[in-house]
Amino acid sequence: MIFNASQDSKTEIEYQTISSTQTYLAEEQSERLHNLISKEQLEKLNQAFNERPDSQVGFDDLRGLLLEQDITFNDAVYNRLFLKINQNRDFMVDWNEFVSYLIFGFQEEDPSSQKESLILPISVAPSVRKTEHRSTVCCVALLKAKSDQVPIEEVTETVNFSFGGEDSPEASGMWVTASHEGMLRFWTSHMEPIRTATSESSKPHAVYCMSYAFYNNGKVHSKLVLGDYAGNVRILSYSPNLRGPFQAKPGAALIEVVWADVLKGKIPQMIPKEYINLHNEMISCVHYSLHMNALFATAEYRNTKKYRGRCPGMIMVTYDERSNFRVPLGVSTFFVAESHNIVVTGGPDTFVRIWDVYIPTEPSAILTGHNGGIVMVFVQPEENKVYSVDYQKIIKVWDLQEHTLLQTYGELVRLIHPSETDMTYFYHSHLRELIVAGRKLISIKCCPRVRVDLTDGNTHAAPVSVVLYNRLFRNIVTCGLDSYIIVWDPWSGRRKIIMKNCHTKMIYGEIIDIEITAATFDPLEQFLLTGARDGTLKIWNYNNAVVVRNMSIMPDQEVTSVIWVVDRILAMGWDRQVTEFNDVEGREYGDPKKWSKFHTDDITCADVKLGEGVVTATYSGEVIFWKLETGQPYRRYSVMDPTRFIELKLTPEEEKLMRRSKRLMSRLGSSRMSRATAITMPKADDGRDYGQNVPISVQAVLFLQTRPQTIQHGSVFISLDTGYIQVYSHHSRGGYMSQFLSVHKTGDCVLTMCTDRKNRYIYTGTAFGYIKVWHIVNYCVPEAEKVHVCMPRLRLEFIFMRKEFWVTRAKRVVRHQREPLLVSSYKAHLKAINSIAFINLPKIVFSGSHDYSCRLWTQGGRYLGTLGTVLPWSKLSPFERAGSENQVYRLPPDIKKVASSTTLKVISGVQMDRPAKRAEVKAPEDRDEETAQTDDGYDLKKIFDKPLKEPILGKHFTLPGKSVMDQRIDVDTTQSYIAVYTHLKVHHTEMLERLPTPAVISRVAGENYMDHYVPVEGKVDLSGSALNIKQPPRRNVRPNDPRNMRMAKTRGDMGPGPSPSQQSE
C-alpha cells in the first residue's frame, strides 16, 4: 500500500516501514527529536518554516531542513518520524504539528505521569467489628515494633510493594484501646482480641495527649512527650538500651514513678524537661521530631473575643527558639512529614493548611472543602497524598504537590450512628490503615501496598477488554471496562499516557463511565478507534488524548467489533448489521451506510481480509461472508451444520422474527436486557447442553492474511463455545473444511485468537485463562504446499513438546490429532483471556484478561512481566528476540499457587522430571553371585527368615464382594438430554417401629417436684452434702412464742414418720 507524500515531489512513503516486516537494524536509532534539537536549531527551523508558503513543508523538504541542522536519519527511521509528526494525515507538516511532536516527547518522559493511580486511594471496603468495651473507646494507641522515624543516613528509596510479612506481630505491632471506665484491650494487627487489663490513676493536671519518638537502632535517646489540660508540655528522655528504666525488677509486677522524684533526679535513667504554660489552653496534640530535634505542640483557641485570631495555634520549639504558627481558632491535629520538611495542620476552622517547617509566617497551601472541623490529618509522603477527616466523619484525600482533591469518602457516615460524635482516630503508617474507634472498631486501608507474594499488580482498574500493538510508535495500547485507555512502553515497562473517562453517559445528572468493548488502529496506525457498550464510537489521537471524531451505530447497542480500512470504518454489534462510516476528508460527517441486514441475532465478532472480504458471526452461530468493496454477502453458514448450503435470503419465520424483534426493541428502548458476550467469563461448572435445539455461539473469528482465496486453502478460523475451532475457505465456492478441539477442559472455549505475520502459528486465549500455540503451516492447505517440519527445532523453542514420563492432560487430548500441532499450552491468567496479540520481531505474546492484567510472554511461554507492575522491569528491545536460555524466569505469584506440572515446566523453562531407570532383569546365576557378594545387612533372607503368610495385613476391614446380580442400566439416549431421575430406583419409606419407653423414664416423667420440696429455715452446710441441712440454734424456748407454735404445727402436720425427702434419700 503506497501513499503520496507531497504535492510538490514524487516521493512515496511505504506502509511497509511501520510494519514488522522490516529486517533487523544493526543499531537502534532514536526518533526523539526533543533530545537532538537545541534552542538555536529550533529557532532556525522556525524561521525556515515561516519562509515556506503556508508555513508547510513536505516529506523531502522536512528532511532537508533537518539535514541543514546536522540531524540525520536513515530511510526507515525517517519514514516513521514523518508519520508521527504528520497528525493531520495530509502529508504536509506545519509548525504547530512539529512543535506538538516535541512537546509530546517531553511529556512522555515526565515522571509524574507514572505515579497517577488507576484506582481511588480508598477503594477497599472497610472492616468493622465490635470494641468489646462497656463504653465508648476514648483512646487508640499502637504498640509499635518499628519506629516511624528513621535516621537520615538510613533512609532508603521507598517502594510501593511488600512481600506479605508486614502484617505479622513482629513487624506491625499491637493495637491498644482504652475506654472511660479504665479498661484496656490489646488487639493484633488484624483486630483480633488478645487480652484485657484495667488502670486507675489520678493527677492534678491530667495528661491529655502523649507522643513517643524513638529510633530502631537505639543510639539516640527516646522521647516521651506529655501534654496536659493546663497547657504544659513535659518530656522524658531516656536511653532504650536494655529497656532503660523499664527493666523488670524481681518481686515487682508494676513499676510506679512519681513525677516529683523524676524532677529531683532520684531516677537517673530519666532526664526530664518541662515547658510550663507553653499554651494558654489545653494541649491538643504533641510530637517530637528526632530528625529536626524539635518539639511540636498545638492547642485550640475557640474564644475569639479573648484572643482575636492572634493565637499561636502551633508552637515549634528547637533548642531555645520558638516558632509560632498562627492559625485562627487554633489547631486540633497535625502531622509532620520529615522527608518533605512540611507540617499539615487542621483545626475547627475547617481548613487544612500545609506549612514549611522553616517558614511559620504563612502556609504554603490551604485546602478547602470540609464542612466541619478537622479532627485528624496524616500524610503519605511516598504517595504524595494528604488525608483529612472532619467532625462529620467525611474523609478527603488531597494531592500533596498539586493541592487538588482526589477523593471524598463518606462511608463512615453509614457505618457510625449519628449520635456518636467523639471518635478516636489513629493511622498505622506501616500497614497504611486508618483505625476509627467508638462503639465499633473500623479499619480503612488507605492506598495499600501491592502484595507481590500474591500478585504482580494490575494493568487496569477493571477487566481488560482489548490489547493492541502499534507498529508506528512501537507501544502497546490497552482498553478496559473501566473506560480507560492506557499507552505503555513495553520495552521499559513505563506507562506513557493514561486517558480516563473515555466513554461516558449522563444519567440523572450523574456521569457514568461506559465500558470499552472494541478497538483498532487506522491503516497508518496514527489514530485509535474505540467502540463502547452504549453504541458510541470515538476516534482518538491517543498521543495527546484528544477526541477527533464521535460516531454511533445505534443507541444502547453494544459495539462488539470495529474494522478500519482505507477510507472506510466498519462497525458491528448488537444492531445485527454492519454500519459503514466514511473516512474521506470532507465526507466524514455524512450519514453512515447500513449494509443489508441478514443476521437474525447479535453479532459477536468479525474480521477482515484486506482487499477481499469481511466475515461476521453471531451469537446463534450464523456466519456470513461479505464482499469488502461492495458490501454484498456471498456465502452464509451455520456452525451447527456447516456443510449445509444456506440461501442468502430471509425465511418467512426469520422475517416474522425480525419484525417481532423490531417491535420489542422499540418498546424496551434503553432497558434492553444485557446478554453475556465473549468478555464475560463462563463458569467452569456451567451445565449447558449442546443439543439439537440449543444454538452454538461463535466467540471469535480470524482471517489468515497470507493464504489465498482458493477452495483448497482454509483461511478463516472460527471459534465456538463448545471448545472447537472450525476452518472455512472464504472462496465463493469454498466452505467448511475441518475442525479441531482447542481446549483440554470441559466447559472451556477460545475467546480470542491472533497469528504471526507469516501465519505459521495461531495463538489462542481461552475462558479458563490458558494460552495455546498451534503450528498451522501444513493445516488445511493443498498437499503440494505442505513443507517438512523440523521437530527437533520446535522442541528447542517450545519446551512443551519435550517428552515426559507421564503424558499430561493437554497432550492426551490431542494425542490422536496430527494437524494442527499443539506446540505450547500453559495457564497465563486466573480468569478469562479477552484479547491476545503478537509482536513479530521480538516474538512476544501479550494477553489482556478479566483479572485486570495484561501480561507479556515469549513465544515459548516464558513470563516476561505484567504491565503496571511495581517490580523492576526486565529491559526488552523491539529489534531483538525476547528471552534467552541462560535467563532465569519466574512465575506469576497467582499462577504459582494453581499451576499444573505442564504450566510450571513451560513458564519456568525447566523440565525437572526424568524417566526412572528400570532395573535390569538378570539370570538366576548372576543374581546368586551378586547376593553372595552383598553385605549381610542387605541380605533379604536374613531380614525375613521365612515367607510371609496370610493374612499379611492382619485383622482389617475387607470390602464387601460384588453382587451376583449384574444391575445394568439402559440409558435412553434418543433425546438431546438424558433424564436421569427416570432411571433411578426409588424405594418407598416404611413406618419405623417405636421402641417402648423404659419404666424408669416413665416413673420420673410422672413425678412432681413438689412432693420432694421441704420448706426449711436455716443455713446450708457447704462442707457436706447439699441435703445436709443444719437448723439454726435456738437461744431460748418460750412456750408462747408464735415461732415455736408454727414449727410445732409444721412438725405435727408432717407426722412422726420419716419425711418424703428422707425416703427418697
Curated annotation (Swiss-Prot):
Biased-composition ranges, Acidic residues, are: 926-936
**Which intervals of the chain form a coiled coil?**
none
Write out the ranges of the repeats annotated as WD. Answer: 153-197, 326-365, 369-408, 459-498, 511-550, 598-638, 745-784, 828-867
State the superkingdom. Answer: Eukaryota
Stretches the record annotates as Disordered: 915-936, 1024-1065
What are the cysteine partners in each disulfide bond?
A: none
Cross-referenced Pfam families: WD40 (PF00400)
Q: Where is the composition biased (Basic and acidic residues)?
A: 915-925
Q: Which UniProt keywords apply?
A: Repeat, WD repeat
- The answer, when asked if Repeat is one of the entry's keywords, is yes
Q: What is this protein called?
A: WD repeat-containing protein on Y chromosome
The organism is Drosophila persimilis
